[in-house]
């Protein structure tokens, strides 16, 4: 286990060639403490957690611009609040910009402010360009690296997510604080672009330095998922659980991966036990978007497998309802819709669809609203049609956009819920036009992910209704 580095003061940041415009050593150390917790996906109680650190940071130097950029950026990157609906967040962005204009900042700091402001306006690609400008000159700027990594993920820019880290990876020598975590960040981009061996090697290197690196655990979980290595995946999660279960911002998602292996095996009760024991409690405690998405995705997958999830949708509905008008990420919207449909709440369903349609009609520079008309709305309508028992309509909506769904972001494993939706619709369709779609989709799935028990079950189902001939 790597020893924790001391928190960096003004001079230490200067020595790292990342000077911060503040004279407060306390503010500099709290900036480092917050950044460290963000990278580790863990609220460290000994540091006071992210919220505690940000509160103390603001008190230490109320006009510390990078403190504002990080605090506001973290709220935005969480995708649970929009400047359109959250006046406090809107004010925070404006305050950050105003303070930045009153000080002689470095170019790096000015770019950070511009990137956060641009992200707040929904122009994620432009924000990434600004973070990349920082990384060209300052390859060890972890905040720029992490913010861009997360934004690329939301955009479905898989190659950029990988290459962004490849460009700066050689500069992260072992003496730099948090350097081992860069291995994990790089490994995830490699994994999402199907470089599984390279990704696993890097993730395992990171874990040999820090076994508690929950993001590297997460990369390995993905690799086993994508290769249908169910036994290996389950063993890995069981053996490593004690190391990652306290990473409170990612543990729920790692448990979700564990549950996916169980769903793949057809062990539905065991999967529901993980949901009830770990995933739902995390959602109710944190209200984090990742936990909402995990909950909705898991219940929806189980339902497609014919499993009764009882009243569980009712537990998720209040959070989905609260965010149904946000329209920050189309990926989130699709999952909120699963909850409102699953809980049979037509009012929330209608509100989500109507306000999303409105957003798509005047998108401005918002990348998600620009994508809503051609991809987001057809996907959402397909979920509605599936619920209403119109499988042929689901195919008509999804087949033309299936290769564009990656643009909604999320991981390959997360977006697989939409592949499964398409296959189930094809299995249930009645139109002769669509009679060979299920066979085609299943052959494609089997070629990409051989030895998948879930695919084998679907092929058997197709055979019983004579769709594999």
Swiss-Prot record:
TPR repeats lie at residues 108-141, 180-213, 252-285. It comes from the Eukaryota. Keywords: Acetylation, Phosphoprotein, Repeat, TPR repeat. CDD domains: StaR_like (cd05804). The modification Phosphoserine is found at residue 5. The modification N-acetylalanine is found at residue 2. One of its GO terms (cellular component) is extracellular exosome. Gene3D superfamilies: Tetratricopeptide repeat domain (1.25.40.10). The keyword Phosphoprotein applies. Belongs to the TTC38 family. This is Tetratricopeptide repeat protein 38. The gene is TTC38.
